[in-house]
Amino acid sequence: MDVLYSLSKTLKDARDKIVEGTLYSNVSDLIQQFNQMVITMNGNEFQTGGIGNLPIRNWNFDFGLLGTTLLNLDANYVETARNTIDYFVDFVDNVCMDEMVRESQRNGIAPQSDSLRKLSGVKFKRINFDNSSEYIENWNLQNRRQRTGFTFHKPNIFPYSASFTLNRSQPAHDNLMGTMWLNAGSEIQVAGFDYSCAINAPANTQQFEHIVQLRRVLTTATITLLPDAERFSFPRVINSADGTTTWYFNPVIFRPNNVEIEFLLNGQIINNYQARFGTIIARNFDTIRLSFQLMRPPPQNMTPAVAALFPNAPPFEHHATVGLTLRIESAICESVLADASETMLANVTSVRQEYAVPVGPVFPPGMNWTDLITNYSPSREDNLQRVFTVASIRSMLIK
């Protein structure tokens, strides 16, 4: 993997900097590195493809070296370099695709394609290394089973989940009380509702709670917490739990009271925030517990218009609702996760779909992320680490 990254980095720099008119002295170090790459690769043969519709291609390396000059690089010099660069780029692209479409239940962190296995040989270590890539650094750590740490802008840690629970229900579904939620990616939205606006609740207050267990531990998380759940702020028709009927939800939004959020690790509270919105920090957690209340305003605090919305007896045409939105803006995770700000999952999925790669023993059909993160096994993590690393290498050359 180190060699593949070094090849890609060298080729990217060469493609960007070996251009007509450039002073040789400005790129002499790069050209020496380029020539070392050519010397190491010359005389070797590789084969890529042969899985799904990815065609088999044979690669032979026999290229001349770039010379020295006291002047600027001319058109002939650049054209010679470009021919070599284009062939090498095509080779790296195919090695990456060949690697991205393969998976293994055992030691999925190790190279799976014949071409990348060959590049891992001792003879290719002479290619100049550049391990500045975060993915490469973490691949090396994961490969040695040492601690890894991945910084993501928006980690897709929550499997998609959209449902509701009813704490009070009737066959007519005309006086309901319960909780709705939508968890996906890096965001949780949860709403508590009571058709009767807590008219018969103790102290005219309804208590709601929403608990989310993460599939992996997050640390040093920057989180936004808002006293609203906009996805549950408009009328809708909802299917009943048994699917035999539908019920009408017509929310009128209240601000939640006594909001408390707890971040827990192995059942122990690590961070606790009460009535605090905006940006908050969670140090280390694998579970999030949100609790909040709906409080019915005293009659003297209701204007006639508000009192008309929430009568003391049925029918209840408007439904009191409170909600919260929790959004993980950034966090550190020791596991490999898809990230809203990166294209690795999209790149891997696109290549696998484009070449009709058959479903293997590790990844679900279509690389369904909800399935992946819901059943996140060590085997899946190893394979994701490898294919995401390769995807990051490929993205240096192929946009």
From Swiss-Prot:
Main location group: virion
Family annotation (Pfam families): Rota_Capsid_VP6 (PF00980)
Keyword list, A-Z: Calcium, Capsid protein, Intermediate capsid protein, Metal-binding, Ubl conjugation, Virion, Zinc
Ranges where the record places region Interaction with the inner capsid protein VP2: 62-73
Positions of Ca(2+) binding: N266, D286
Biological process annotations from GO: fusion of virus membrane with host plasma membrane
Cellular component terms per the entry's GO annotation: viral envelope; viral intermediate capsid
UniProt keyword Protease present: no
Location within or outside the cell: Virion
Post-translational modification, as annotated: The N-terminus is blocked. Sumoylated with SUMO1 and SUMO2. Sumoylation of viral proteins seems to have a positive role on viral replication.
Residues that hold Zn(2+) according to the record: H153
Source superkingdom: Viruses
Keyword Lipoprotein appears in the UniProt entry: no
One GO molecular-function entry: host cell surface receptor binding
Record's function text: Intermediate capsid protein that self assembles to form an icosahedral capsid with a T=13 symmetry, which consists of 230 trimers of VP6, with channels at each of its five-fold vertices. This capsid constitutes the middle concentric layer of the viral mature particle. The innermost VP2 capsid and the intermediate VP6 capsid remain intact following cell entry to protect the dsRNA from degradation and to prevent unfavorable antiviral responses in the host cell during all the replication cycle of the virus.
Annotated protein name in UniProt: Intermediate capsid protein VP6
Native organism: Rotavirus A (isolate RVA/Equine/United States/FI-23/1981/G14P4[12]) (RV-A)
